[in-house]
Curated annotation (Swiss-Prot):
The gene is purH. One of its GO terms (biological process) is 'de novo' IMP biosynthetic process. Keywords: Hydrolase, Multifunctional enzyme, Purine biosynthesis, Transferase. It comes from the Bacteria. InterPro entries: AICAR_Tfase_dup_dom_sf (IPR024051), Cytidine_deaminase-like (IPR016193), MGS-like_dom (IPR011607), MGS-like_dom_sf (IPR036914), PurH-like (IPR002695). Its EC number is 2.1.2.3, 3.5.4.10. It comes from Chlorobaculum tepidum (strain ATCC 49652 / DSM 12025 / NBRC 103806 / TLS). The keyword Transferase applies. This is Bifunctional purine biosynthesis protein PurH.
Length: 523
């Protein structure tokens, strides 16, 4: 079948960007244009010959525009197979004219529900019915019909029509049809999520639909032989997008591994939003140093001293604008990425001298609500994000000795961090500084040994420190190892059948211990 020449177009758009120029070009190629509502008024006002869709249907737009294109003469004109004799006969008998081009974009439902003060009624009125119906009909018959949903495709269609005798190519029609089904799928996903939330549906539900749209292409994944990309995601709690939260100000493109580390570093620094100056240093998604201090530079020095080797090539996040003193200290070593809510005067210029370093501006907080998804060979695991916190007054003191105010401050500091570290996790903290990080071990005792060893490597004295465990101590041995290191207070979930043994061991060593009642495994 030859590529059909476009003779008749149906145009109805919410986003009117470029539509006047596009239709003016169509008219110059003798394309007959039919339109609706505001689009029709705009085109006619611009001096373009365009007719109301009612001239095709013989039926007026009714019910405040809810019904205008849902008509057999529209969908028959879109769906008719042009070289099918029966279809041609049905079209003649019913006065149906073929429609060769559909230009439609949909009511802005997502933009509408993103408004803080949107009402349910307003959201409902922005659910497009006729638009998706026309798009799907046109896309189904892509052998004969060209369908355009994206302003960015106007130029391609016009160029092909000019060079192809008024027709588009089969390859282009098929590509545009694929975009239609991706669009309508995402559109319906957003509506379904909004309706479920409005209905008060709790939990993940029996079915879930994710809306994913590529935001960034990447050279490769975790390793060079793996392909990768970053996708915007709408899981029903709003769109999660890198560019909405971050802006890369300097350096080469961010890699897949960079993105994982940025997520890890900012996830921890978010715990200290609004608190005194805090710094997080991350390597391979685990923190190798976290600290708070009266100044940002002091906080950085403390975080760095936790592990003076791992920060090389690492990622550093700050909860304050990066000042010149701190930037100069950071500049003493090579770091992959620096993330800050702002950069003070002169700092960017100084840091940009190292071309291999990326500088990232965090424009807004990370979203906390929502779901976490992990792909497996046998399906998708879905869980709520681990975002629940414990206030000091919710802690249960289970030992004879109460923690001091200083110990309590360190315990709360440690508990904010421990859930961001791979399990099993043992974390030593002193004076709002990580002193030893034991991460990702199969044995909790081994995690404790590693944390103690890391502290000894940089001559950090664990006497007077506190320890946090992401899960309960199954035996007293882990706690006794901490006591031997000089720990004075412990924070852990509790819940072991041997809790009493652990509590007795704590009392025997004059330790203060609190239970949170909340485990923080991270696999």
């Amino acid at each position: 079948m030859l590529d059909p020449v476009i003779k008749r177009a149906l145009v109805s758009v919410s986003d009117k960007t470029g539509i006047v120029d596009f239709c003016r070009e169509l008219a110059s190629m003798d394309v007959e244009i039919f339109s609706t509502g505001g689009t029709l008024k705009l085109l006619q006002g611009a001096g373009i010959v365009a007719q109301s869709i009612s001239t095709i249907t013989g039926f007026p737009e009714i019910m405040d525009g809810r019904v205008k294109t849902l008509h057999p003469k529209i969908h028959g004109g879109l769906l008719a197979v042009r070289d099918n004799a029966e279809h041609q006969k049905a079209a003649r008998e019913n006065g149906i004219q073929f429609i060769d081009l559909v230009v439609v974009n949909l009511y802005p439902f997502e933009a509408t529900i993103a408004k803080a003060d949107v009402t349910f009624e307003e959201a409902i009125e922005n659910i497009d019915i006729g638009g998706p119906s026309m798009l799907r009909s046109a896309a189904k018959n892509n052998e004969s019909v060209t369908v355009v949903t994206d302003v960015a495709d106007y130029a391609t269609v016009l160029d092909e029509m000019r060079s192809n005798g008024g027709a588009t190519t089969r390859a282009t029609r098929l590509t545009l049809a694929a975009k239609v089904y991706a669009l309508t799928s995402r559109y319906d996903t957003a509506i379904a999520a909004y309706m479920a939330k409005a209905a008060g549906v709790k939990g993940a539900g029996d079915t879930m639909t994710l809306k994913l749209e590529k935001e960034l292409s990447m050279r490769y994944g975790e390793n060079p032989h793996q392909s990768a990309g970053l996708y915007k995601m709408d899981d029903g709690n709003g769109v999660r997008s890198f560019s909405a939260i971050f802006e890369k100000l300097h350096g080469k493109e961010l890699s897949y591994n960079n993105m994982l580390d940025i997520a890890a570093a900012t996830g921890i620094i978010e715990e200290f939003r609004g608190e005194e100056p805090s710094v997080v240093i991350v390597k391979h998604t685990n923190p190798c140093g976290v600290a708070q201090a009266p100044t940002l530079c002091e906080a950085y020095r403390k975080a760095f001293s936790t592990d003076t080797q791992a920060p090389f090539g690492g990622i550093i996040a700050f909860n304050r604008p990066l000042d010149m003193e701190t930037a100069s200290a950071v500049n003493e070593i090579f770091t992959e990425i620096l993330i800050a809510p702002a950069f003070e005067d002169g700092v960017l210029e100084m840091l940009m001298k190292k071309k291999d370093r990326r500088l990232v501006l965090q424009k807004q907080p990370l979203p906390k609500a929502g779901w976490e998804f992990k792909s497996t060979p046998f399906g998708m695991l879905v869980q709520e994000r681990d975002s629940k916190t414990v206030a000091p007054e919710e802690l249960k003191v289970v030992t004879k000795r109460q923690p001091t105010a200083e110990e309590l401050a360190d315990l709360m500091f440690a508990w904010k961090i421990v859930r961001h570290i791979k399990s099993n996790t043992i974390l030593y903290v002193k004076n709002r500084q990580t002193f030893g990080v034991g991460a990702g071990q199969m044995s909790r005792v081994d995690s404790s040994k590693i944390a103690r060893w890391k502290a000894s490597e940089v001559a950090l004295d664990l006497r007077g420190s506190v320890v946090a465990s992401d899960a309960f101590f199954p035996f007293a041995d882990g706690l006794l190892a901490a006591a031997e290191a000089g720990v004075t207070a412990v924070i852990q979930p509790g819940g072991s059948i041997r809790d009493n043994e652990v509590i007795e061991a704590a009392d025997a060593n004059n330790l203060a211990m609190v239970f949170t009642g909340m485990r923080h495994f991270k696999h």
